Amino acid sequence: MLKQRSEKVYDLASLAQTEKFAKLSPDFTTIWNYRREILDHLFNEGQGQFSTLQGKLEVIKNELMMLVKQVMASPKSYSIWEHRVWTITLGLKLEREFIAAMKAKKLAEKAEEEKKQHDAA
């Protein structure tokens, strides 16, 4: 796992491995840091489920669900709580982007409708 991190292997398989290792050793901060690096990379690459805001929000939701299980198993693990804060912060940022995109879409639709009405008159 550490070799993968040093080689900057940021893929879904590595993400799955970090989850397994985190369950075995929730206080191993390096695993959580690597997990954040993987998620950052996947979000920035924007492929597959990471290509849309809705997909990214779904990933965040799944990450939070995984973290609930981790917190229940190890409620005093600082590393888990730190990752949870990071995940929530990222989720809020993405949610703001999603809301802004939806508002922009509605404004564009309204402007298009007004243009059609104006052209018809």
Predicted regions and their residues:
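Long, highly charged low-complexity segments
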Residues: 1-10, 14, 24, 102-121
